[in-house]
C-alpha cells in the first residue's frame, strides 16, 4: 500500500460519503473505500485500476462530474498542476471538503498553503513521511479553463518557427529543455516511414519531425494525459497531422516503425525512475522495422551504450554537449 494511502486510511472515518480520489496510486485504496471513485492522468496507473476496479476510475485532464461531498488530491510534482487540480476539484465541491495528501520530500508543507485560496487549511495527520491537510470550500470557484493556462512559445528552427503549447504539469513546462535542444539539431537522415516520438511531452520533437519529414506517418506517445493534450495542441498550432496516444512505455507503441526518436522520461512523480527509459532500450528492436533507427538523448553519465548494443545493435554517439549525448542505433 502506498504510504499516502495508508495516511488516508488512518482517517477513514472522514471518507464515509461519496469521494473523488484525484491522482490516486494503483494500490488497494479503492477496495478499502468502496464509496470512492478515481481520477487519474497516468496511463499506466489507470490501466492497473481498470483491471482491478472496472469503471471506478477515469483517465482525463478534467475532473469527472459526480455527487461528491469530498475529494482528495494526491500531490503532484508541479506547483502549476497542483493549482489547476485544486481549482478543478474545488469547483465540484461547493460547501464540501477538499483534502491534500503528499510526501514531505514532495513539498506537502509548501503545497498546503495553496489550499488557502479556498478556506482555512488544517493539518489532520502526519505519518509515514506524509501529511494530510483539509479545507472546507467556503466559496467554490468557477471551473478552470485548462487551455487558458497553457504557456506558448516559439522555437526558431531551420525550416521556420515552431509553436509549442505547454500545459501545467508537462515536462519542462513553458520552455525548451537542454536535452531536447541538442536532439533537435540531430534529426537529419532518419529513415522514412512511420516515426515515433516516445515520451513526447509538449510534442516538440514530434512536431519538428513532421515538419522535416512531411510524408512520414507520425505517432507521439506519453504516459501523461496532460502531455498527450499538450502534444495535440502543439500539432494543431502548427497545422501538422499526427496520432497522439496515451500509453505506459514502449510496450504500448506501434510496431514496424522506421524510427523512434526520444528524450526519454526519468521521473515518476517526485522520484527518479529510469525504468521506462531502460525498457525502451531493451524493447526498441521489437517495435522497429528491419533497418529502423533508435535516436535518443540522454544524460552523459548514464551507461546506455552497452544496453543499446546488447539489445539493438552498434551504438554511435552523434553529438555531445551541456551534459547530454545523442545516441543512434539501427535494427539489423
From Swiss-Prot:
The keyword tRNA-binding does not apply. It catalyses: guanosine(1207) in 16S rRNA + S-adenosyl-L-methionine = N(2)-methylguanosine(1207) in 16S rRNA + S-adenosyl-L-homocysteine + H(+). Its EC number is 2.1.1.172. It is found in: Cytoplasm. GO terms for cellular component: cytoplasm. Keywords: Cytoplasm, Methyltransferase, rRNA processing, S-adenosyl-L-methionine, Transferase. GO terms for molecular function: 16S rRNA (guanine(1207)-N(2))-methyltransferase activity; nucleic acid binding. It is an enzyme of class 2 (transferase). The keyword S-adenosyl-L-methionine applies. InterPro entries: DNA_methylase_N6_adenine_CS, Mtase_sm_N, rRNA_ssu_MeTfrase_C, RsmC/RlmG, SAM-dependent_MTases_sf, Small_mtfrase_dom. CDD domains: AdoMet_MTases (cd02440). Belongs to the methyltransferase superfamily. RsmC family. Specifically methylates the guanine in position 1207 of 16S rRNA in the 30S particle. Monomer. This is Ribosomal RNA small subunit methyltransferase C. It comes from Pseudomonas aeruginosa (strain LESB58).
Amino acid at each position: 500500500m502506498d504510504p499516502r494511502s495508508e495516511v488516508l486510511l488512518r482517517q477513514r472515518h472522514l471518507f464515509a460519503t461519496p469521494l473523488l480520489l484525484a491522482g490516486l496510486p494503483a494500490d488497494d485504496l479503492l477496495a478499502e473505500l468502496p464509496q470512492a471513485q478515481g481520477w487519474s492522468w497516468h496511463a499506466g496507473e489507470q490501466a492497473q485500476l481498470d483491471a482491478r476496479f472496472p469503471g471506478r476510475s477515469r483517465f482525463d485532464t478534467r475532473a469527472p462530474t459526480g455527487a461528491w461531498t469530498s475529494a482528495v488530491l494526491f500531490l503532484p510534482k508541479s506547483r502549476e498542476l497542483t493549482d489547476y487540480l485544486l481549482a478543478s476539484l474545488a469547483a465540484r465541491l461547493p460547501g464540501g471538503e477538499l483534502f491534500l495528501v503528499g510526501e514531505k520530500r514532495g513539498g506537502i508543507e509548501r503545497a498546503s498553503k495553496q489550499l488557502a485560496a479556498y478556506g482555512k487549511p488544517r493539518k489532520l495527520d502526519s505519518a509515514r513521511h506524509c501529511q494530510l491537510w483539509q479545507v472546507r470550500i467556503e466559496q467554490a470557484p468557477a471551473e478552470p479553463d485548462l487551455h487558458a493556462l497553457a504557456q506558448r512559445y516559439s522555437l526558431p528552427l531551420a525550416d521556420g518557427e515552431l509553436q509549442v503549447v505547454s500545459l501545467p504539469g508537462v515536462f519542462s513546462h513553458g520552455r525548451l529543455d537542454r536535452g531536447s535542444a541538442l536532439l533537435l539539431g540531430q534529426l537529419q537522415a532518419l529513415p522514412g516511414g512511420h516515426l515515433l516520438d516516445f515520451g513526447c511531452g509538449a510534442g516538440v520533437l514530434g512536431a519538428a519531425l513532421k515538419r522535416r519529414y512531411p510524408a512520414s506517418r507520425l505517432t507521439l506517445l506519453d504516459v501523461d494525459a496532460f502531455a498527450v493534450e499538450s502534444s495535440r495542441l502543439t500539432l494543431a498550432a502548427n497545422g501538422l497531422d499526427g496520432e497522439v496516444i496515451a500509453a505506459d512505455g514502449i510496450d504500448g507503441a506501434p510496431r514496424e516503425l522506421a524510427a523512434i526518436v526520444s528524450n526519454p522520461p526519468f521521473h515518476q512523480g517526485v522520484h527518479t525512475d529510469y525504468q521506462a527509459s531502460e525498457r525502451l532500450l531493451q524493447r526498441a528492436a521489437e517495435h522497429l522495422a528491419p533497418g529502423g533507427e533508435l535516436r535518443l538523448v540522454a544524460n552523459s553519465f548514464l551507461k546506455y551504450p552497452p544496453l543499446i548494443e546488447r539489445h539493438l545493435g552498434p551504438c554511435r554517439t552523434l553529438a555531445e554537449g551541456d551534459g547530454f549525448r545523442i545516441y543512434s542505433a539501427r535494427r539489423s
